[in-house]
Each structure stands twice: as structure tokens, then as C-alpha cells.
Amino acid sequence: MMNRRLQAFFFRTAVVLALGSVYPVQVVSAQETAVDEPPYEQQLMRLSEIFGALHFLRPLCKESDTPSWRDRMEDFLDAETLDENRRRRFIERFNQGYRGFSVAYRECTEAARLAMAQYLSEGEVIISDVTSRYGR
């Protein structure tokens, strides 16, 4: 059974996914060279990295999550990104989070469990901050 903290994190993740419909990405014309980033862009980039880290750490420590963190990332991308370049940046951050831990850990250790707990906590803070500041 899922603990309350993890359930709260999943709920907040769903709220962030819904932000994609509240704050759609602006369509750029041919003359524009860059897409205006939403004010919470860096927080979402960090969240992507956290998703990648958790996608590696949770199964390593025999934690089964349904849907997987990769599936959550795909849902997030579908909800948040219309621009292909922006989508690629989120994917790269996810992959950085995954690779960073895959090089360091081959088995679940106390340090891996601590990192996992800290990432869950940081993800909760990011989601709470983004939804409270921009979800209105």
C-alpha cells in the first residue's frame, strides 16, 4: 500500500500535469527565435531531473510504482510541451537525473534510499510551489 507522502506527491504531480492546459506554450512565428519560457520553467526542468533519478532509484530499491516514473514523465511532456525543442530539454534533464545515479549506484544502499527520500521531498516542494504560485 502506498504511503500518504507518496500519494500526496502523486496528486501534486497530477496537478502540475494539469498546468499544461492552464499555461499553454506560446506559439512562435517564423520571425521569433525563442519561445518565451513560463516563469516556472527552471522548476519544471528540475522536476524532470528528479523524475529521471526516481526512475532509476525506486526500482533499484525494490519500490514498484505504477505508473512508472518514465510514464509519469511522458504524461508530463504530453501535458506541458508543444514545442519540440522544449520537449527535448525536459527529456535531457530526465536522462541526466537517471544517468547521474546509474553511474553511482549498482545496488540499493542507505545513501540511495536517502537520495530517493530527498528527491521525493524536493519534488513535492517544487510541485507545491508551482501549483500555489501559478495554478490559479
Where would I find each of the regions flagged by the language model?
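N-terminal secretory signal peptides that target proteins for export/translocation
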Residues: 1-8
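Compact alpha-helical subdomains of small soluble proteins
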Residues: 65-136
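N-terminal secretory signal peptides
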Residues: 30-75, 129-136
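Alpha-helical transmembrane segments
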Residues: 9-14, 44-47
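Bacterial N-terminal signal peptides
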Residues: 12-24
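Sec/Tat signal peptide C-region and signal peptidase I cleavage site
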Residues: 24-30
